[in-house]
Amino acid sequence: MVGTWFLCRGFTTLAGLLLLPFGSLAASQIEDQAEQFFRSGHTNNWAVLVCTSRFWFNYRHVANTLSVYRSVKRLGIPDSHIVLMLADDMACNPRNPKPATVYSHKNMELNVYGDDVEVDYRSYVVTVENFLRVLTGRIPPSTPRSKRLLSDDRSNILIYMTGHGGNGFLKFQDSEEITNIELADAFEQMWQKRRYNELLFIIDTCQGASMYERFYSPNIMALASSQVGEDSLSHQPDPAIGVHLMDRYTFYVLEFLEEINPASQTNMNDLFQVCPKSLCVSTPGHRTDPFQRDPKHVLITDFFGSVRKVEITTETISLQPDSGIMKSSHEKAGMDEELMEPLKYAEQLPVAQIIHQKPKLKDWHPPGGFILGLWALIIMVFFKTYGIKHMKFIF
């Protein structure tokens, strides 16, 4: 009996000694994962979206900016991490036939102004000075948090700008301009002050590529709607309001983004191809040499989406629900599967359905026969009133 006890004890000790390295290995792997997570260079995303144009005929520039705003919000970036600057309030413009709305598509179903737009800088507050102060953090202490870019050295920042520009400059409010040198220096200040990890700069304007020619700071990727010497063209004219609804480049970028979901593996190389010259008429450009990573390894959601926080733990968590609840949920799920087919992520969003639906039919116009009959009636009344002698005054 004693021998049997010593034999069992020996086997138990031997098994413990054999399993000890495996337990240590698992614990070390978890520690390595935790250390890698906390040392990650990317923990949060920010967006600075700027429309620099005023006046009703620049309606499309406001629609451009609001469309990008809705896309980044849909992919998870909250308003607290978005700085929205609109140089004019098209939603409340007296010429707007549908007040409190801004549309980006002909079918007039997608109101990009929406009910939850938070404009941080509006009207004449949108200036070159305020824009540069937001980027560099040189703002008065009384400035509210919603108007601050509170990024750090782990922040990926999307900066989108649209308006009227030329070779090496972008106009603000038709009264001042920012040059490519000023913009490059602002980005360098951001890098020196550790205000970003990686930066994506997108500009939709004439000769947009000239705005990123002077960049010299690291970890910047830039895209433009047109090359130097080219115009960036508008898209979707709407006779009802007398202006174009969007610019071509931003229109196709928006269509591309509507197919992206938070778990998408689409990379930046795909974004470079969204608007070829056959669609944009202008030649879009991009610059990646200051960027350290290969664009094909950079996900779209690294800039347009939220960063999902992951908590690593060694504790055991039970994932088994209550048996009664599980049974009822399975029965309900079975009924739902019979009633509906599975949908893709983009198909579940009302925005995507609106964008890809066919435009509404044009307004009713009288048929040609009706017009001819009306003219015949007018001529008969004329003859009856004045006679054939006045015919020479018509022809």
From Swiss-Prot:
Residues annotated as signal peptide: 1-27
Segments in the Cytoplasmic topological domain: 386-395
Active site annotation, chain numbering: 164 (proton donor), 206 (nucleophile)
Pathway(s) the chain acts in: Glycolipid biosynthesis; glycosylphosphatidylinositol-anchor biosynthesis
Coiled coil location: none
Record-listed Ca(2+) binding positions: 79, 82, 118, 120
Subcellular location: Endoplasmic reticulum membrane
Membrane-spanning ranges: 369-385
InterPro entries in UniProt: GPI_transamidase, Peptidase_C13
GO molecular function ontology, one term from the record: GPI-anchor transamidase activity
Role of this protein: Catalytic subunit of the glycosylphosphatidylinositol-anchor (GPI-anchor) transamidase (GPI-T) complex that catalyzes the formation of the linkage between a proprotein and a GPI-anchor and participates in GPI anchored protein biosynthesis. Recognizes diverse proproteins at a C-terminal signal peptide (CSP) region that lacks consensus sequence and replaces it with a GPI-anchor via a transamidation reaction. Transamidation catalysis reaction follows a two-phase mechanism.
Repeat found in the keyword field: no
Membrane topology label: Single-pass type I membrane protein
Enzyme class: transferase
Example of a GO cellular component annotation carried by this entry: GPI-anchor transamidase complex
UniProt: a protein binding residues: 206, 232, 234
PANTHER family associated with the record: GPI-ANCHOR TRANSAMIDASE
Binding partners and assembly: Heteropentamer. Part of the GPI-anchor transamidase complex, consisting of PIGK, PIGT, PIGS, PIGU and GAA1. Interacts with GPAA1. Interacts with PIGT; this interaction, via a disulfide link, stabilizes the expression of GAA1 and PIGK and links them to PIGS.
Enzyme Commission (EC) number: 2.6.1.-
Alphabetic keyword roster: Calcium, Disulfide bond, Endoplasmic reticulum, GPI-anchor biosynthesis, Membrane, Metal-binding, Signal, Transferase, Transmembrane, Transmembrane helix
Designated name of the protein: GPI-anchor transamidase
Lumenal side, ranges: 28-368
Chain spans, region Autoinhibitory loop: 231-236
Main localization (coarse): endoplasmic reticulum
Disulfide-bond pairs as recorded: 275-280
